[in-house]
Amino acid sequence: MSPSLFLGWGDDYFVVLWIHGRAVRLGRRQGVGRVIRVSLAMLILLALTFSPIVHATCVQTEPSTSANNGSWACSDQGEAFAKASSMGVPADLSVCRMKSIRAVSSGPGVFSQRMTYPGDTCGIGYDLDIGTGNATYPDTATCAKRPSQSGWTNPTAPTPSDVCNDGCYYTYAVDAGGPKGYTYVPSGATCTTDDAAPPIDDGGDGDDDGGGDGGGDGGGDGGGDGGGDGGGDGGGDGGGDGGGDGGGDGDGGGDGDGDGDGDGDGEEGGEGAPMSELYKKSGKTVESVLSKFNTQVRGTPMVAGIGDFMKVPSGGSCPVFSLGASKWWDAMTINFHCGGDFLAFLRAAGWVILAIAAYAAIRIAVT
C-alpha cells in the first residue's frame, strides 16, 4: 500500500512521520491537496503538544471504517492508552469470535489496539493477531510527567487506595501538609479502571459542609425559645392553686403554702440559660473525624517508619519495562506489577514479612 497521511491497516509509516518529522518521505510529488493535509496534521499535533488544557480530548486523524477504528492523536500517554483500550470491535470483524482485545505499545508515542481471533473462525485456519486502530501522543508527554494531585478525594476513604485517572496510574502518599492529609503521585504506568478506581472530584466537599451547618443552627434556636415559655406558665399555675386550697379548708393552710411555694420555685428555673448557651456545636462530622484520625495516625513515627520500610526507593515511579517488537512477537510493555491484584499481592506479602519479623523480635526480647 502506498504511503498516505491517513492510513488504515499499515499506519507505521505515518507514525514515523509524526515522531521524527520526516516529511520528505511523503513522496516526490505530493500535490496541493497532500501538502494541505500535512499542514493540518502538523497544526493538530502542535495544538495538542502546547495546549494549556491538561486533559484534552483525543482528535481523530483518520476516519473509522467497518473494519478499522481509525487513528487518533491524544495529548499524553495516559489518554492515548485509554483511547486505544476503549475502542470497540469493528463491525466486519465481529462475526469472528474475538479471543482478546488490548492496547499495546507499538513504538515510541503509539498505542495500537490489538485483537486475536481463534483459528477455527472465518476460514483463517490459525490464530490471527491484527491491529484495528491506534492512538498517538507526543513521546515526551508520559504519565510520569503529570503533576501530583492533592485535591482529589480517596474513592475508598478512610481506607487508602491508588487511583486511575485518564489512563495514568497514581499512588496514594501521606502528605501531612496537604489539605486532605494525602497526595496522589503519578507512578508512570498506564492503567484502566479495572486496575484502580477513578478519584472523586473535590467539588463535592462544599455541598456537604453547607448542609451540616444549617442543621446545627436551627436546633440551637429552638431549644432557647422552649425554655422561656415553660418558665412563665409554671409561675401562673402555682399562684392559683395555692390560694384556693388554703381558704376553703381552714385547717388545711399547710397544704396551701406547700403548693404555692413549689410552683413559685419553678418560675425561677424558667429564667435559666437557654440551650444555645449550654451547648455549642463543634461542626465536626463522622467523615472529618475519621479523616483527621487517619492523618494523625499515619503521621506518627512508627507508621511513617513502616511506610518507609515498605517503599521501594525508585524516585516515586513504578519501573516499567519495554520489549521491542521482532518477527516473532509484538512490542510489549511489562507493567502489570504496577497495579491491580499483583501489586496488592506484593504489598500484602510485605506486611506479612514485617509481621513475622516483629513477632520474632518480640520473642528475642522476652526470652
Curated annotation (Swiss-Prot):
Residues 193-276 are annotated as: Disordered. Residues 202-211, 252-270 have a biased composition (Acidic residues). Disulfide bonds: none annotated. The keyword Cell cycle does not apply. Residues 212-251 have a biased composition (Gly residues). The chain crosses the membrane at residues 342-362. Keywords: Host membrane, Host-virus interaction, Membrane, Transmembrane, Transmembrane helix, Viral attachment to host adhesion receptor, Viral attachment to host cell, Viral attachment to host cell pilus, Viral attachment to host entry receptor, Viral extrusion, Viral penetration into host cytoplasm, Viral penetration into host cytoplasm via pilus retraction, Viral release from host cell, Virion, Virus entry into host cell. GO terms for cellular component: host cell membrane; membrane; virion component. It is a single-pass membrane protein. It is found in: Virion; Host membrane. The keyword Transmembrane applies. One of its GO terms (biological process) is viral extrusion. Plays essential roles both in the penetration of the viral genome into the bacterial host via pilus retraction and in the extrusion process. During the initial step of infection, G3P mediates adsorption of the phage to its primary receptor, the tip of host F pilus. Attachment of the phage causes pilus retraction bringing the viral particle into close proximity of the host cell inner membrane. Subsequent interaction with a secondary host entry receptor induces penetration of the viral DNA into the host cytoplasm. Belongs to the inovirus G3P protein family. Interacts with G6P; this interaction is required for proper integration of G3P and G6P into the virion. Interacts with G8P. Interacts with the tip of the host pilus. Interacts (via N-terminus) with host TolA. This is Attachment protein G3P.
